[in-house]
């Protein structure tokens, strides 16, 4: 009986230990610092390459600058580069003001009303919020053609860094904030990388981190399948990241959502850019320099991707183990507030640490004098959702005309997106064009198109829900302004099936 009691006690103790992870407060601080510093280093390094190499790797002979003083110089002279950071910090500042249970509306309004320029899903979400559409509707693909873009992926870091060792806690944050501007695969990018950050606190195995984090993503999603492929291709080509890049390009590089990426080499889709982050992590194998360079040389969003990779690796290594070469000039940049915020790196090192302590306690962990006890739980998949289900881009109609009074076009399909340009960079003029949109002779919507760059509407109009068949769209400008033009660029047409065969309008070479 005595032996049985001892055995049972040992099993209970083992079970409790298996469900927690203890790390020192010193290590926790060091890892949080490493995560924020890593992001900053990565985005600064990749900045000159951002969207200069689309659909191609960056040439081997292409030099990328890095020198002492470069971090401070870039932060002061090109503050808009750091959208990865200032978007994160917007949400961090809300948590700091209102606590970890800050309402979603506070996060949505804080970023929508901020003074910084935004693009893609972030800007579309901002426009929706400023015009009365709150999350999660603001990020849904039928209200936001950029729903699958990279946006929440590049700003999810805070969710992981305040949830050390707790991937499901990070997912809880992402489920709320990620839907402000994204949906489907765009949302999954932030869930996945947020989970990777959390696991970097409790594991030094990059292979484990990227595989275990994937358990937060539904298996039937395109995002899961792509990242799973990257992990498999890494095993198949363990020493040649370019082979894996080619496999990604061949299988996953067709963007069907983002209007700027459909029928174009440009790709800001979260799935492909997450693949590049994972390529950097897997082939970097814990080497900071290799990781940021490979993630950058994959191209496309070549500043955000090394930022994510370096942030995750910086968390795993901790600040002190980031090589000195990559911290050249970092100290002199750590007290500079990121533009549009009141927060510097030194500030967020401490704020992030305090938020992590509070989040550990909120999820049943413990904080002692010199350590934290983190509750461990297996990552759980978030709910399945899919953007652009049942619609396929089949044609781009070039327009390239100023909308003077009205313009109309006809097409056969079930949906369309009209791209237009009406805002001027840095404009703060309150004027907004007013356009009535008619579909098949009936008013579909009346849109306001600000010329103010910060509050602009990314696309003029879109509709993915028409019955399959012939349609006509008519655009009527109600208030022309001699100081501004509303430039119609093109219309992307969607059908209920992809165009796979030659017809009376297009030739299609089948595989």
Residue ranges and their predicted role:
Residues 422-498:
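Beta-strand-rich ligand-recognition modules
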Residues 1-22:
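Bacterial Sec-dependent N-terminal signal peptides
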């Amino acid at each position: 009986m005595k032996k049985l009691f001892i055995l049972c006690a040992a099993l209970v103790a083992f079970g409790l230990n298996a469900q927690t992870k203890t790390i020192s407060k010193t290590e926790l601080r060091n890892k949080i610092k490493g995560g924020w510093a890593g992001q900053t280093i990565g985005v600064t390094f990749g900045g000159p390459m951002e969207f200069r190499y689309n659909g191609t790797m960056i040439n081997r002979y292409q030099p990328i600058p890095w020198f002492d003083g470069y971090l401070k110089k870039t932060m002061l002279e090109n503050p808009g580069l750091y959208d990865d950071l200032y978007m994160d910090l917007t949400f961090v500042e809300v948590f700091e003001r209102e606590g970890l249970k800050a309402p979603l509306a506070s996060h949505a309004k804080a970023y929508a009303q901020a003074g910084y320029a935004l693009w893609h899903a972030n800007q579309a979400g901002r426009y929706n919020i400023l015009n009365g559409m709150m999350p999660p509707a603001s990020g849904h693909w039928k209200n936001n053609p950029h729903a699958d873009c990279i946006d929440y992926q590049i700003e999810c870091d805070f969710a992981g860094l305040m949830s050390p060792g707790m991937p499901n806690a990070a997912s809880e944050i992402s489920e709320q904030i990620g839907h402000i501007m994204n949906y489907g695969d765009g949302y999954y990018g932030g869930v996945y990388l947020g989970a990777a950050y959390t696991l970097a606190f409790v594991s030094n195995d990059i292979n484990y981190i990227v595989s275990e984090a994937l358990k937060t993503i539904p298996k039937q999603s395109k995002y899961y399948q792509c990242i799973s492929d990257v992990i498999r291709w890494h095993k198949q080509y363990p020493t040649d990241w370019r082979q894996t890049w080619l496999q990604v390009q061949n299988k996953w590089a067709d963007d069907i959502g983002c209007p700027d990426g459909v029928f174009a080499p440009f790709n800001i889709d979260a799935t492909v850019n997450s693949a590049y982050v994972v390529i950097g992590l897997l082939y970097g194998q814990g080497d900071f320099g290799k990781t940021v360079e490979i993630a950058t040389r994959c191209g496309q969003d070549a500043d955000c991707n090394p930022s994510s990779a370096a942030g995750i690796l910086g968390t795993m290594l901790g600040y002190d183990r980031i090589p000195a070469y990559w911290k050249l000039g970092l100290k002199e940049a750590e007290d500079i507030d990121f533009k549009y915020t009141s927060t510097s790196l030194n500030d967020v090192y401490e704020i992030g640490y305090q938020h992590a302590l509070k989040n550990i306690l909120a999820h049943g962990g413990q904080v002692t004098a010199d350590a934290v006890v983190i509750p461990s739980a297996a990552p759980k998949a978030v709910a399945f959702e899919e953007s652009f289900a049942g619609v396929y881009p089949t044609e781009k109609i070039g327009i390239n005309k100023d909308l003077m009074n009205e313009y109309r076009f006809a097409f056969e399909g079930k949906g369309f997106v009209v791209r237009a340009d009406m805002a001027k960079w840095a404009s703060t003029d309150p004027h907004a064009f007013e356009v009535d949109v008619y579909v098949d002779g009936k008013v579909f919507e009346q849109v306001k198109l600000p010329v103010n760059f910060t509050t602009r509407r990314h696309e003029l109009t879109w509709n993915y829900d028409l019955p399959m068949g012939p349609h006509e769209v008519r655009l009527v400008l109600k208030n022309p302004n001699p100081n501004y033009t509303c430039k119609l660029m093109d219309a992307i047409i969607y059908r209920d099936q992809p165009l796979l065969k030659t017809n009376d309008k297009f030739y299609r070479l089948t595989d």
